[in-house]
Amino acid sequence: MSKHQTQVVGDFTIGPEIGRGSFANVYKGYDNRTKAPVAVKSVFRSRLKNQKLVENLEIEISILKNLKNPHIVALLDCVKTDQYFHLFMEYCSLGDLSYFIRRRDQLVQTHPLISSILERYPSPPNSHGLNKVLVVNFLKQLASALEFLRDQNLVHRDIKPQNLLLSPPVHSKEEFKRKGYSGLWELPVLKIADFGFARFLPSTSMAETLCGSPLYMAPEILRYEKYNAKADLWSVGAVIYEMSVGKPPFRASNHVELLRKIEKSKDEITFPVSAEVPDDLVRLICGLLKANPTERMGFQEFFNDPLIVYDVQCADEPLECSNVDEQLFISEYLPNLKTSPPAKPAPETIKEESEEEERAERAPTDSLLIGKEADLRIPRPMEGSGKDEVIKKLINKSSPPPDTVKDGQIKKGARRDKDDFVYEKDYVVVEKRTVEVNAIADELAKAGAGAVAIPSPHLGTNEHSAANPSGPTETQTQRRFSPSSRTSSIGSNRRPSWGDRKMPISISPTNALTKALGYTSNRLFGQQQQQPQQAQQAAIESAITNVTTNLLATKTLRPLKPSQETSLEDTEVINQLELLATMAHAISLFAEVKFSQLIPLPPSSSSPGSADYDEMYQNDAFPPQMVKSISSEGVALYVETLSLLAKAMSIASDWWHQNSSKPSTSPKLNDLVQWIRSRFNESLEKAEFLRLRLADANEQLVGESGSSLNKPVVAEKLIFDRALEMSRTAAMNELKNEDLLGCELSYSTAIWMLEALLSNDEEPVTGNEKLDAEDKKIIELFINSIGNRLKVLRQKIDKQGVRS
């Protein structure tokens, strides 16, 4: 539905858009029966791509239906259509608290009510915060709502200014008392909204799910420790600080840096002198912003704080609001802005560290932490792959913060970046391979005989599987990549891998794969034949992912000798698929670091659709420019991943076209193909999410002040730089004889990332080579250099007996 259309749904008419997010848009509407204004949260069904997201929405609906409190936004009705879940909610015409804080200087000139409020209760000179009376008013109302939630054993888990909505003040003190409001009757009324993360949590219970917005997230959640309802009190402290000062207490470009800053502060909260924050507010804020939850102020102490219990001196007279139209949304009073309020509050990102601080940040002892302190918000693709998390930590520790907005980067009226269109084309090319990828996977899944037949995983089958059951067509099977092509991993024209050039293979990767699959097959087809199909597929995928991840840490692959189980021809294909799958896995771990920066998830979460896949709500803490930077890099990396996986599936397709007459297929080959199909669909889904975030960020930048003029994102450069940075960090650790196994993993992953650049050296759109001869020569030199380092390191590890 466009911004200017009206649509009748049930007893309501939906009007213009007043806000938007990745999963829902918010519209202004009205009740056809009473003509009263309403807010309509329209959630896109198409973007709820897994059951967990649907469950979150249903939880929000069920909670709101049963919550009746004057300081909680009321749910009036809910209507489901083919395209949307429409939530008709109480209309708060003054927008959210964040918008009120950020836009008050403009609103004071155009909005009669805001002008009257700030004239009566002005902010301190040179302060970006609010007057103490306003802060205490909102604080009392927030405390009232939280006390109600505590009585219901509910924890909100996403308290932030963007979720605190404001309604105009009531018209009399009598009406204020009759409706049960807290605070000051002549001032705006604050209401808590967005219960998508809320859950029932008795006071003695602990939770461990990561949710909420990073800038307001309690440190125990950032550390992945179990937490209780007191996590909400940290968020309250951060909100009070922002009301008083005009910015969050801690700001950073990523979650790890945010936690580092919180811990570095040692509970010493700094307040700008210009903010003139009163002592009693300072005391309350410092009591709430205790990093250790056991030292943090408790709920009863908070509810009994003098600022909340005692009345504050005020004018006790109604504000001048005779010219206020309470049905107009607050942003409509700013004629130069779009109807939709701009993006959620844009926190300033950290300034560049000095060179000495940067070197300290990269110190070897800090680069490879594997404890809770180093945990990152990274979605974990498969439960069985513990090394994946280590690799992503290594990648992230080597990651500089995303580019921040600098002066001159934004120009009004600028067109969209050219590289946006380039990556759109690349994305479309790999997206079009979806049907082909799933078609060949379906065919191979059906081709087994007897006990060796492997069931299709059906991951995304409804959306992605080919509709043609008769098998791939001629055009589907004759792909650009074949076993004899230049880009194939074996054959006379194959570029020798680093393993071929430098060292013998002591452990056959495919033997490792055979053992893993043999164990899995015994469970599937031996004593546990009645195992549910979903559990079977989880076991298969876990085994494949374990092996693929292990290949990152073991020797690079070589053509293998035939075994009794597998023919030479099958072995060659399996070898090629393992090579490409491992390269794709290495790049996808890098891509998921970017993905996780916009969607914070716990490391225990698994693939989309699983019960542990946490809320995929957008990260509202980042300004549009940073979202653009992160998402564009993520899309570029996922395109590289998808290209490698598509190439692997093309090889499988060519093999199947020549061998479809065989009575059965190799279980190992089949499992690899199903794993590749699953990874392709998962990567495509995540790339699509990032692409939508990129489009939203571009629209916000164009709407506010023009598009950014960033340097174009080049996936090859991202991968190359990160591989070298990981190697440098590993070398520093190795010299200090620290975390040698982590060094081995860093070196190995770096080699695979560089090998992927050489293997995937072709533009998806034009077919031209991405790298020139000089680039390839440089990459080869680094592969050899890192490989030599890895060989020496492994000798040291074996000599010291570190593995044991």
UniProtKB/Swiss-Prot annotation:
Keyword Ligase attributed: no
Stretches assigned to the Protein kinase domain: 12-308
Residue ranges of the region described as Disordered: 339-364, 395-415, 455-506
The entry's keywords: ATP-binding, Autophagy, Cytoplasm, Kinase, Membrane, Nucleotide-binding, Protein transport, Serine/threonine-protein kinase, Transferase, Transport
Subcellular location: Cytoplasm; Preautophagosomal structure membrane
Enzyme class: transferase
An example Gene Ontology biological process: protein transport
Entries under Gene3D superfamilies matching the protein: Transferase(Phosphotransferase) domain 1
EC number assigned by the record: 2.7.11.1
GO MF terms, alphabetically ordered: ATP binding; protein serine kinase activity; protein serine/threonine kinase activity
Biased segments, Basic and acidic residues type: 404-415
A matching Pfam family: ATG1-like_MIT1
Catalytic site positions: D158 (proton acceptor)
A single GO cellular-component term on record: phagophore assembly site membrane
Residues the record lists as binding ATP: I18, G19, R20, G21, S22, F23, A24, N25, V26, K41
Compositionally biased tracts (Polar residues): 462-495
Reactions performed catalytically: L-seryl-[protein] + ATP = O-phospho-L-seryl-[protein] + ADP + H(+); L-threonyl-[protein] + ATP = O-phospho-L-threonyl-[protein] + ADP + H(+)
Topology term for the membrane: Peripheral membrane protein
Quaternary structure and interacting proteins, as annotated: Homodimer. Forms a ternary complex with ATG13 and ATG17.
Family: Belongs to the protein kinase superfamily. Ser/Thr protein kinase family. APG1/unc-51/ULK1 subfamily.
Function of the molecule: Serine/threonine protein kinase involved in the cytoplasm to vacuole transport (Cvt) and found to be essential in autophagy, where it is required for the formation of autophagosomes. Involved in the clearance of protein aggregates which cannot be efficiently cleared by the proteasome. Required for selective autophagic degradation of the nucleus (nucleophagy) as well as for mitophagy which contributes to regulate mitochondrial quantity and quality by eliminating the mitochondria to a basal level to fulfill cellular energy requirements and preventing excess ROS production.
Name the UniProt record assigns to this protein: Serine/threonine-protein kinase ATG1
Gene behind the chain: ATG1
